[in-house]
Amino acid sequence: MSSVKVAVRVRPFNSREISRESKCIIEMSGNTTCITNPKVPPGTSDSIKRFNYDYSYWSHDPRDAEFSTQSMVYADIGEEMLQHSFDGYNVCIFAYGQTGAGKSYTMMGKQEESQEGVIPMICKDLFRRIQETEGVDLKYSVEVSYMEIYCERVRDLLNPKNKGNLKVREHPLLGPYVEDLSKLAVTSYQDIHDLIDEGNKARTVAATNMNETSSRSHAVFTIFFTQRRVDKMTSLETEKVSKISLVDLAGSERADSTGAKGTRLKEGANINKSLTTLGKVISALAEVASKSKKSKKADFIPYRDSVLTWLLRENLGGNSKTAMIAAISPADINYDETLSTLRYADRAKQIVCKAVVNEDANAKLIRELKEEIQKLRELLKAEGIEVQEGNRRTPTPMICSPNRLRKRTGSSTEMAVDQLQASEKLIAELNETWEEKLKRTEQIRLQREAVFAEMGVAVKEDGITVGVFSPKKSPHLVNLNEDPTLSECLLYYIKDGLTRLGTSEANVPQDIQLSGSHILKEHCVFENKDGVVTLVPHKDALVYLNGRKLVEPEVLQTGSRVILGKNHVFRFTHPEQAREKREKPKDKDVGENPGGNAEAADWNFAQCELLEKQGIDLKAEMQKRLCALEEQFKREKLAADQEFEEQRKTYEARIDALQKQVEEQSMTMSMYSSYSPEDFHQEEDIFVNPLFESCWTAREAGLAAWAFRKWRYHQFTSLRDDLWGNAIFLKEANAISVELKKKVQFQFTLLTDTLYSPLPPELAPSPIIGGALTNGQEDEFGQSPIPRTIVAVEVTDTKNGATHHWSLDKLRQRLELMREMYHNEAELSPTSPDYNVESLTGGDPFYDRFPWFRMVGRSFVYLSNLLYPVPLVHKVAIVNERGDVRGYLRVAVQPVMDEENADFNNGVKQSARIVFDEEQNGGHKIPKIRTIHDKDEKYIEGSNDIMKLEELEQEDADSGRGDSSVASELHESNEHEPGEHLQPGKEFTFRVTVLQATGIAAEYADIFCQFNFLHRHEEAFSTEPVKNSGSGAPLGFYHVQNITVPVTKSFIEYLKTQPIVFKVFGHYQNHPLHKDAKQDCQITRPPPRRMLPPSIPISQPVRSPKFGPLPCPPSSTVLAKHDVLVWFEICELAPNGEYVPAVVDHSDDLPCRGLYLLHQGIQRRIRITIVHEPTAEVKWKDIRELVVGRIRNQPEPADELDDSDSCVLSLGLFPGEVLEVPGDDRSFFRFEAAWDSSLHNSALLNRVTQTGEQIFITLSAYLELENCARPAIITKDLSMIIYGRDARTGPRSLKHLFSGQYRNPEANRLSGVYELSLRRASEAGSPGVQRRQRRVLDTSSTYVRGEENLHGWRPRGDSLIFDHQWELEKLTRLEEVGRVRHLLMLRERLGMDTTPNPTTKTEKDVCNLAQRASASPVHMVIPPSPQTPVKDQQTPTLPERELTPRETELVWKCVKLIQGRIGGKGDPSDTSNQLAVDASPGDEGCADMNASYISGNSIELCSPDRVDIPNGWEAPAPVPQSQEVSLRLYVPELEEIRVSPVVARKGYLNVLEHGGSGWKKRWVTVRRPYVFIFRSDKDPVERAVLNLATAQVECSEDQAAMVKVPNTFSVVTKHRGYLLQTLGDKEVHDWLYAINPLLAGQIR
């Protein structure tokens, strides 16, 4: 056995590719061929594809050192194949590739020296070796045949008598062969060369008549090579017969690449049918070769689907040594075709051939043929026909009785005669001697010469047609063809006198005979008088001369183009005129003589000339079409712009109206809070009341806008939706991590973009829908929005001691790779080099790269002391992202008033120059900063997020202590012009000194610090790393940085409001590289995909013509879930008039899978039975519609919509009925529908299914349930095979044949498991319905495979939101404390704290309460009620005394402000109780949320539903009971469950149902989380289903003692209980482990 040799050869650019400036996308290195995808960015995983072959020939540029010539190709492939033929093997070489890729050049070559192809070289070398080795004991004989396969028709190219299409037959020994194909004997290479030339000319004549090109046909040149050797010792003659098949395939390009239309498109499809079948054969053979030897199933190879593959059957995977040469183009414009060719060749490389030496086959063959002839004669004699010996044609009937004649059948007689004639032809061919073969070859040559002479084709004196030489004196015509290989192959002499041209049917013999469309019987006459040739057209004949239609006679000039009819193109050549022109050059018109050279006119030139002269200018037509397209584009663009402008105006008007409405509602609600309750009892229009007239000041309007903006950015519900909706993905990732033994854990976390915790770009939130903006942008009020919070995934890498943050999108992307790592095998070609799993997945999806240094925390130092100017030494806290203080940093900031340059012995001194430029942009001042380091100037745009000092003043004014405000005094002192050191235009230098860091944990080894301005994140000033010994001693940096700034307004504004950010980094001690650890990159190879069972995808419902597109199911709470078992049957009309279920093949052994075996042309019905546990919530009323569509021959449905699917059919229905099954108390509902499959107008359903094919359909049943607003939809994909009307649809395997299950009619059904969810229907117009529909279900409790390995781990939920609010509160307090501390230090430095402001007793009490609140977490602060004595709530350090009513009111007001509440004067405890009471007992989710809000006491939403209801208001009246009943509607949702193919356990169990009659032996299969119950192991239909996810499993000795039955355990579902007994003692634990592994582990 040996595999097919595959070589790839790339050709140079052609003129078309050069004109388009194509790029080379092919690279070759050794035997590896690489192709680059020009449509994919370089560097990606799909940009370069590599393939390995036996040979890779680089023939792109002759100047390259690696250039491969024709002789090199022959030396590698041709010589090896020729040696195999001498050894007695069959040999085949075939070339494959798109048109113009170089197939014909590689196989045939050119006439020039060293340009010959593989075929001439093999023939030449064959006869050279014959001459060298032939002797007395060794004789050779060579025969050749040449045929063409075009559109599945075979044509003989060597025998002119075989004008028709030859038949392809198959012999038991010879295999497929072509009947009556000429096999001509040859004795030298010149004979073969002449025959090839003759065959090409016959191919040219036929192609011209039929308007074909050689690129659209396959050519097969076969050499039959026989060796006869005489053994001297035994005097026996042995014989070896080798067959050398040389195949030139048709072009493999696509239809859209060639632009073919009409007939040429159909022709291409027919030709591509052969190539497609060849591809299928190669793929099937490669699949067989890659399968294991244990596979006993016979694989089907589609040889008979095309003539080409049928004839090449021995060469493809049979008795042959085969080589394939794939010719490819190097241009990027042919990427798709080139890649297809490379993949084709890659598959062919895997084919294994089993070649044997062909010895002494003739004697055996002759004997078997004689025996077959004798049997056929006896068969004919029995039928009443006697065939005499030697009579091969006409049978002689015997005299027989009339009864005997009536028994004869004409078809069998004709078939027997046909077989007899074919066998006798083979015997005659085998018995023909070599001399007879040579004589027959000579006769065929003479016949061929006569035929060519009759057609007018010029021949030499020896009878060979003119091909490569041109006459020296006689004028002549040379053919031109679209295919360059067929051009200038035929030459027609113009004799002296008249040369007539027409068809063979003319009354007067024609000298030149043509055929084809638009050629008249007498078409034209060439008159040669004294060397001057005149073309005389006949009436109504289509004759074109140089593109002009010829009506009158005209003299021909050498080089003229003559077109006769539609297809025949010639160039007229007169040697005498050409010689005169060379001697006396004259200026000729370019149109009459292109380029001054007659030979330059080819077929393309003649066609373009014809179009141009007939008034069809291609360039003008293209320009005209282009102009029309441009005009159309302009019109469409103008219309689109106008439509867009109208939509923009409409949306702007709607936005303005909504904005105005929101503002009015906000102002109305503000007025409500100040309106007295008694005023509402007065009967008047409240909006006419002057109280509701807007009389706000600018400050009040700003506060209202601020409150609205703050309310708009609350996002607790969306965060909860993200947590609930993605919990299942988090659980699955953790489960896979545990099963693969990855040391990675995933958990939810919340991230907010703050100063201490800026978000990286990959985690930055997207814009809020509805008008909100992203971070860093300003809203319509000119204010920076509140930072958004996102849900992220915290990845704890315990292997590397690292922590990463992933976005939810990244988690889903990585989860796909985790699933692929766990389930699927990377599909790579076995011949592809550098096989590496990591090249596909990009590394391990569980791990990320981690930096060497990690962030310890951030600090902020304000610079307002430089305004005065005074030096300050700051001690600022180093705070991490969670608000934890990780240490302290001492930083000194001081102005440099003169050019001092003191020496710093222990520190580092550096200088930098920063320029603040002012730029006006949209009315906002934006500092544009540029920094100069080492005299290099860089411009960096600054940030527009600038805090204004006036805001601080407003905050102090709100506190009621304007007289003691720190910022107000500093602001007043700085209202005047800045000091002399900050005059605009001057330069100001200040110094930042990083002194020490204290309190940093010992887990960080090397500590260094970076600091920069807020608007400059890309460049920073950095200190040197300092060792951290962990002893607690301060870490001294003593880094000095001088900064010089030209003073501008932007710089002064920055000094007033903005700090410098300091980032402290440390090297983590537990870094794995400390121990020279290396990341384990080994990835366990996943199981092959072929080991996993094939699955039919779950389709979406087929759209109903009656109901139309149904709205999306609501996201309301699921009230109930039920497991539904559905049985599907297709019934056919039986002879007794009843509808019997069609046979279902369950041979796949997969759950809920089967194949319907139907008959063609029989009436059918579809029967569906629904089985479920009895419940009051599910009551089936009737079937409303049954729709069948999406008819296809592959499992996956097409992407087209049901609207465009013409095969969708609504079936006629029969009323549904409720069944009562004796002994089964489950609910059964069954309905039927009449199915006339012919109404689909689908060929797949109308015809008998082909071998190896299956038909798939999708049906959807729309059922009506009680108390449901919408129909329930059952959707199922069914597969089937349609046999003939009288065919037997039996089982396909012996297992099912002997099991007898097909004799059971109840086995001929298919099961489906569905989950019915009932949701509360929501009114579309109810308030807040859109917000409620946005909520998602909590998926944290959904079962995930492998969840039991997590040992109780759960994803975090609502508590994470409140914990994060406390973290944000800590960050806000730390930021404000740092700013106030800086201002207090500055006041003290300036001497402004000499007279401290008096503090009242009330303020002290408020401060004490605030201190107590800050000392404990927020969720521990429970405010006391006013009735509780204050002394019980105070700390022991405060004096005990009663508060006055005024003090109590102030205390509660301050506490509410701290806790972020806005409300009236009611008691908070009363409000909490009211909220708890209002929560509906049935809505557990809402009750839990309210409880968490109450217990949390954190910041609440400032929405109207959270505002305390003033006294005197009445709650809305409850809904009447009758109205509530009428609105109690559900929305059903039926979803098919994909049952796992993995069987955890199966076997017999004794089953006792609760309330059942007794124990029953049943076959039970566990496919988690379901248990299926069958009647027996031979029963293929699921009879009952148990859902383990909602069941309780118990096994105890007490239970066994109570029932007095050993080896039992119980399974209790929501509706019934089962008692299961195993057949043996040892099986109990195994069954428990399959059903409930945790319970089995506890028992064991």
UniProtKB/Swiss-Prot annotation:
Domain PH positions: 1542-1640
Which segments of the protein form a coiled coil according to its record?
Answer: 358-436, 631-672
Polar residues bias located where? 1428-1437
**UniProt xrefs under CDD domains:** FHA_KIF1, KISc_KIF1A_KIF1B, PH_KIFIA_KIFIB
Asked whether the keyword Manganese is assigned, the reply is no
Q: Which SUPFAM superfamilies match?
A: P-loop containing nucleoside triphosphate hydrolases, PH domain-like, SMAD/FHA domain
List the biased-composition ranges (Basic and acidic residues): 574-591, 969-984
Gene Ontology CC: one annotated term? microtubule associated complex
Q: Could you tell me which residues belong to the region Disordered? A: 574-598, 953-985, 1419-1440
Q: How does it assemble?
A: Monomer.
Return the protein name. Answer: Kinesin-like protein unc-104
